[in-house]
Amino acid sequence: MAKGFYISKALGILGILLGVAAVATIIALSVVYAQEKNKNAEHVPQAPTSPTITTTAAITLDQSKPWNRYRLPTTLLPDSYNVTLRPYLTPNADGLYIFKGKSIVRLLCQEPTDVIIIHSKKLNYTTQGHMVVLRGVGDSQVPEIDRTELVELTEYLVVHLKGSLQPGHMYEMESEFQGELADDLAGFYRSEYMEGNVKKVLATTQMQSTDARKSFPCFDEPAMKATFNITLIHPNNLTALSNMPPKGSSTPLAEDPNWSVTEFETTPVMSTYLLAYIVSEFQSVNETAQNGVLIRIWARPNAIAEGHGMYALNVTGPILNFFANHYNTSYPLPKSDQIALPDFNAGAMENWGLVTYRENALLFDPQSSSISNKERVVTVIAHELAHQWFGNLVTLAWWNDLWLNEGFASYVEYLGADHAEPTWNLKDLIVPGDVYRVMAVDALASSHPLTTPAEEVNTPAQISEMFDSISYSKGASVIRMLSNFLTEDLFKEGLASYLHAFAYQNTTYLDLWEHLQKAVDAQTSIRLPDTVRAIMDRWTLQMGFPVITVDTKTGNISQKHFLLDSESNVTRSSAFDYLWIVPISSIKNGVMQDHYWLRDVSQAQNDLFKTASDDWVLLNVNVTGYFQVNYDEDNWRMIQHQLQTNLSVIPVINRAQVIYDSFNLATAHMVPVTLALDNTLFLNGEKEYMPWQAALSSLSYFSLMFDRSEVYGPMKKYLRKQVEPLFQHFETLTKNWTERPENLMDQYSEINAISTACSNGLPQCENLAKTLFDQWMSDPENNPIHPNLRSTIYCNAIAQGGQDQWDFAWGQLQQAQLVNEADKLRSALACSNEVWLLNRYLGYTLNPDLIRKQDATSTINSIASNVIGQPLAWDFVQSNWKKLFQDYGGGSFSFSNLIQGVTRRFSSEFELQQLEQFKKNNMDVGFGSGTRALEQALEKTKANIKWVKENKEVVLNWFIEHS
């Protein structure tokens, strides 16, 4: 699943607006982590009761009863399912949308058992008498059913038998049921959109991780693989899709010719969370790939007619071919459908053969979409198609190893997208998009290892917590590091061996290490200091990462667990004492040096890192290692001198690294904050995107801490001075903003130039924004603002303006036909400086007719990113937490993002007290998947308070001196 924030799976890059309006997203990251699923606790009518049916909600779980444990017993394994579903796309007499279903699951008994336990959630069983009918297969004798019950807390349907099922025998269990086709974005749900003035309704799915059980009774764990025969009964004017192609043409339903029956081919052996089925009037654009695979892009008819699916169609074939070669394994299905949904809480979902997307992750309009929208489409597609092998063909055994699934896809998405767009240098974007982004979380004492013990991940909420930036971005970072020190060819060799060995099966991360080790052992050119497992265990089984410190006078090199707050208490022990086996590359005076391994010791010495008086050395070339680097002050000063005299000697990524690392080290009190600020002085001569992005990203923290204090004025003045040469460069290059640079990185650099100039008050930029927006308001049918610049221009113009500008943008949002344009407007509306407008906007997030449920939390976070909106958003969340939690479901990963977003500025004792009181006040409601984020927010707030006290005066003086 893509980072929905994935989140937010990168994918794009975050542009920082350090202005009066806010810190706003300019280059959107592929739905960075705000995602997965919404579990809406909506009311579902109960089935008629009978003496043989009981509904149990266990309060105190008696663990001796298997139905009170969250993990399924292994006494029964599913072999196959036959599932028929009929969604009703108009409400019934009670005003509810429902679906009806029938399921036959064939079971293989592994051990004698007198109870059948199968997942079921919010389903009402309509079978007469007992909830199910049980039959033997072949000569298998079936005992009578004693009683059936629903256990609400553990989400089970339990069938108690009067005798035992026998090992080696097959049985079939049949049930009929109905459920609500709710708008809760989970399981089998409904999505709505407007076509003109007509409301259209479609039925779609989101099963990951634990909501297949909301669609039909099933063994809803990833290792419980089976084959599926899906049949959909649907209105005859609509199209039915599922994982596999239809067996033939749809046939009329015998009892009602207005309905059609579509039966699909049997799936391969697969996990329940990868199932998908959709009923809609969507249309598609199609092509057949060279290998015979049918590729189709589905969307609303208007979007297809306007060509918004063509870019996705054009890149899908090359990406599929790339991964088939990368994995040395053919694409395992006969077709690849991808569909853009109006309502979808994840960024995208890798359902096997029927991938679902948010519209802004699949659709692209060359006339109205920005370059970052285009980059997002190609990277999200690459992420999801990577899963068709790694995750779908070979699947994790349990959710505690989610990082292997999502981390791997989050790494190779850059490779697949780079193949589709070879001139963009997309592979470099993993550094700002994933590596440094996740280090900010992984450097907290409240972080967690990539691999979590299976026994700690049981409930749906615990599973949802696995879908975080550690799993996605740290997973991607360490797999990239592994591929780099093995070499990509050797890595691919081991990967292909792994996929061939475990096709249609389940694995743990140890299985991948074993096959990579076999590839290492079969050659002699790559020599490792230890086994793949021994090296990687230190990166996956302990949280955090090291800071490597070099003393260039002696050549001494040491490592230490890096913590942003060096005084924080690390309560999680490590079998490796927080030491790592670290692959180190280095440059001395612009020349590459031999590779070096720092073993799992705290200190070593090597002359590679020793310099003469005028020399400098720089470690972690292109940031292929997952660590940060500190030097003695003389070496830092020599690097600064090199950057200010001839910056091209240092690779672009490492120019960004110097900024990222030094600011993080300053936060951790390992270097003076003035040294980090000195590392930005060279930017007045820098034209490349990544160093500027590093500075803006790092300084965004300064903005959050100081935009309510006297530091902010001198800080803005300094940034105006530094960015003005870049602004003038692109003003000339683009012929006064009438053209766009040719390559991706230059376009991103242009966006940073104009966003930084406008948000820090450069008059010519503010005038540009006002002029362009005024032109648009005077002629709404002709938008003169290039899509690349719209986020910046919209935000700045709304910040400068008042109600007229806000209402105009809101009106344009209501009319927007392209979701990318709607996203830009929705974010920009949060830039207003009018308190009453922001409060009104917050209220809109509680009304799904005004702000879609999938967009509610990101809208609140956009308002919170505005210095004026932040206290309003915090008050709003406090006042409405119970409603938000109940309406959206505590399992939704977006709660983690919401807590992070509204507390980012917290840096005072009063705000800390408020946060602690918020925790206390809502213990009865709970925080669901936001529980860890709340603890991290408390930790960050304490660190912020301390940092501001220690650094405010010196930072103020530095900005005054250099502005």
UniProtKB/Swiss-Prot annotation:
Free-text remark on how the cofactor is bound: Binds 1 zinc ion per subunit.
Region of interest: Cytosolic Ser/Thr-rich junction: 33-64
Record localization: Cell membrane
Keywords: Aminopeptidase, Angiogenesis, Cell membrane, Developmental protein, Differentiation, Disulfide bond, Glycoprotein, Host cell receptor for virus entry, Host-virus interaction, Hydrolase, Membrane, Metal-binding, Metalloprotease, Protease, Receptor, Signal-anchor, Sulfation, Transmembrane, Transmembrane helix, Zinc
Active site as annotated: 384 (proton acceptor)
Residue ranges, Cytoplasmic side: 2-8
Pfam families registered for this protein in UniProt: ERAP1_C (PF11838), Peptidase_M1 (PF01433), Peptidase_M1_N (PF17900)
Ranges annotated as spanning the membrane: 9-32
Cited SUPFAM superfamilies: Leukotriene A4 hydrolase N-terminal domain, Metalloproteases ('zincins'), catalytic domain
Extracellular side: 33-963
GO-annotated molecular function: alanyl aminopeptidase activity; metalloaminopeptidase activity; peptide binding; virus receptor activity; zinc ion binding
UniProt GO BP: angiogenesis; cell differentiation; peptide catabolic process; proteolysis
SS bonds (residue pairs): 758-765, 795-831
EC number: 3.4.11.2
UniProt modified residues of type Sulfotyrosine: 171
Catalysed transformations (reactions): Release of an N-terminal amino acid, Xaa-|-Yaa- from a peptide, amide or arylamide. Xaa is preferably Ala, but may be most amino acids including Pro (slow action). When a terminal hydrophobic residue is followed by a prolyl residue, the two may be released as an intact Xaa-Pro dipeptide
Origin: domain of life: Eukaryota
Cofactor section: Zn(2+)
Family under the similarity heading: Belongs to the peptidase M1 family.
Subunit structure and binding partners: Homodimer. Interacts with SLC6A19. (Microbial infection) Interacts with TGEV and PRCoV spike glycoprotein.
Function field: Broad specificity aminopeptidase which plays a role in the final digestion of peptides generated from hydrolysis of proteins by gastric and pancreatic proteases. Also involved in the processing of various peptides including peptide hormones, such as angiotensin III and IV, neuropeptides, and chemokines. May also be involved the cleavage of peptides bound to major histocompatibility complex class II molecules of antigen presenting cells. May have a role in angiogenesis and promote cholesterol crystallization.
Protein name: Aminopeptidase N
Lineage: Eukaryota, Metazoa, Chordata, Craniata, Vertebrata
Protein's gene: ANPEP
